[in-house]
């Protein structure tokens, strides 16, 4: 009997389950050195404000342990490190981590720990961290449910889960404007600034394929988190999701 292969979405393309991690890896290896340019292009520069707001919601505290997953370039970790929290920056992509380490060296920042990790199979003990953060990363995971289950596993009782991700805006008319921008203009921006139209097209498509806010909230609850919340920004173009391991 032939074994039926499973497919998953890679943007608008359906690919074999076993292929997605490698394809996503190739995208982020390509954009690693231009990561800030990519985020500026996707958010018109507002990602910096969103990330500041995200960190205010996390409220990192001195002495606690935080896992910043898919945090390779250190964008979120650098915002949290002065709190005195012990932060591990994890990413599946070596090039993204290398970019973060280089930035840390430029800043003379030695307080962060860097670790190459797959969000679906974390190499950390149970109940290890006080908080888990992931920003603009979970939509690129092959099995989102497995990544959420791992986040729940590595959090201590009373631990906090925070995720910021693109979604679909509910502002009348703005959704069409953003769809036009992300699907037709953004790839051309990618070609102009990074000579990489395909990666930017995937990133736009991956946003469109990500579950709506309330559906993703239900996935977080299904992973075992309690007191889940969704905080939409720009009408839901971006949302901060949170939950507790209790």
Predicted regions mapped to residue ranges:
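A short glycine-rich, Lys/Arg-flanked "PGG" loop and its adjoining helix->strand segment in the class I
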Residues: 145-160
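Class I SAM-dependent methyltransferase SAM/SAH-binding core
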Residues: 65-121
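N-terminal auxiliary segments of SAM/dcSAM-dependent transferases
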Residues: 1-26
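A short acidic, Gly/Pro-enriched loop at the edge of an enzyme's catalytic core
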Residues: 120-132
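Conserved alpha-helix/loop element of class I SAM-dependent methyltransferases that forms part
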Residues: 30, 34-37, 41-64
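Hydrophobic beta-strand segment of the Class I
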Residues: 35, 132-133
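Core SAM-dependent methyltransferase catalytic element
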Residues: 223-246
């Amino acid at each position: 009997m032939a074994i039926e292969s499973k497919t998953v979405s890679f943007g608008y393309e359906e690919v074999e389950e076993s292929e997605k991690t490698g394809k996503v890896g190739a995208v982020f290896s390509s954009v690693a050195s231009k990561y800030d340019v990519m985020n500026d292009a996707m958010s018109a520069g507002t990602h910096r404000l969103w990330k500041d707001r995200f960190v205010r919601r996390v409220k990192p505290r001195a002495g606690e342990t935080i896992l910043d997953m898919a945090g390779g370039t250190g964008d979120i970790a650098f915002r949290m490190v002065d709190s005195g929290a012990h932060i591990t920056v994890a990413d599946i992509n070596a090039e993204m981590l290398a970019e973060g380490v280089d930035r840390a060296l430029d800043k003379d920042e030695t307080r962060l720990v860097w670790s190459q990790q797959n969000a679906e199979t974390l190499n950390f003990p149970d109940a290890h961290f006080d908080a888990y953060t992931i920003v603009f990363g979970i939509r690129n995971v092959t099995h989102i449910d497995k990544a959420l289950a791992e986040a729940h596993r590595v959090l201590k009782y009373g631990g906090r889960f925070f995720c910021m991700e693109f979604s679909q805006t509910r502002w009348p008319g703005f959704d069409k404007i953003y769809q036009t921008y992300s699907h037709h203009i953004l790839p051309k921006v990618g070609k102009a600034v990074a000579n990489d139209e395909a990666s930017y097209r995937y990133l736009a498509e991956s946003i469109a394929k990500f579950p709506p806010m309330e559906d993703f909230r239900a996935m977080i609850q299904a992973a075992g988190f309690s007191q889940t919340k969704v905080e939409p920004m720009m009408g839901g173009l971006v949302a901060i999701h949170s939950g507790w391991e209790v």
